[in-house]
Design a protein with these regions (language model features):
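Generic hydrophobic, helix-prone segments enriched in Leu/Val/Ile
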Residues: 11, 60, 169-170, 180
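Short acidic DE-rich linear segments
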Residues: 4, 175-180
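Canonical phosphoinositide-binding patch of PH/PH-like domains
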Residues: 148-168
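Anionic N-terminal interaction surfaces
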Residues: 2-102
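Edge beta-strand at a domain terminus
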Residues: 166-176
Length: 180
């Protein structure tokens, strides 16, 4: 999906959802853009096995967070030793192990795939965490700051790990809400 097509779909979806009430503390115009992006990317994930090209990945980050630098990125099933400068995602995944990167800011959690581009060129990283089935829970509780499970944007990847991650995330969100 090219950058032009992505922007066109986002604009169309944003126009339709502009009247919807915001579900978070984001400004209404940003909330409608976010909701449009969610719907666009979820639709895309069902038609292209969830893998996005570098242009649409950059567009997703820049349109949602034009003034923010993502604080964390989590790469699933990737050893830290493979994250040398210039490492790239390939059509088979990052070093043939994964095609999913979780982009986290203070407000939102995004899932996005990036193909054929050095990851440091797509996402400025302050910290990298690696998750697998054994440490999903500890990563969620120590790193993620997500107030609303509805903010999850899930692009298909490693379904077993991604499914477990989402389940744990929702549990963590419910526990946090019950304490407030």
């Amino acid at each position: 999906m090219g950058l032009f097509s992505l922007k066109k779909q986002i604009a169309e979806a944003a126009a339709k959802s502009a009247a919807a009430a915001p579900k978070s503390n984001l400004p209404p115009e940003k909330e409608s853009l976010y909701e449009a992006m969610v719907q666009t990317l979820l639709k895309e994930s069902k038609t292209s096995m969830g893998m996005m090209g570098k242009s649409s990945t950059k567009a997703a980050v820049q349109l949602l967070y034009p003034n923010e630098i993502p604080k964390y990125a989590i790469l699933t099933n990737v050893s830290l030793g493979s994250l040398a400068a210039g490492d790239v995602f390939t059509p088979k995944g990052f070093k043939n192990k994964t095609n999913v990167v979780l982009i986290i800011t203070d407000e939102r959690l995004l899932f996005a795939g990036a193909l054929g581009t050095p990851i440091e060129k797509v996402i400025p990283l302050e910290e990298i965490c690696v998750i697998d089935d054994s440490n999903i829970t500890s990563v969620i509780h120590s790193v993620l700051r997500v107030e609303d499970a509805e903010t999850i944007l899930a692009i298909d990847g490693n379904k077993q790990v991604l499914g477990a991650f989402c389940a744990e995330l929702k549990k963590a969100v419910r526990k946090r809400k019950s304490r407030t």
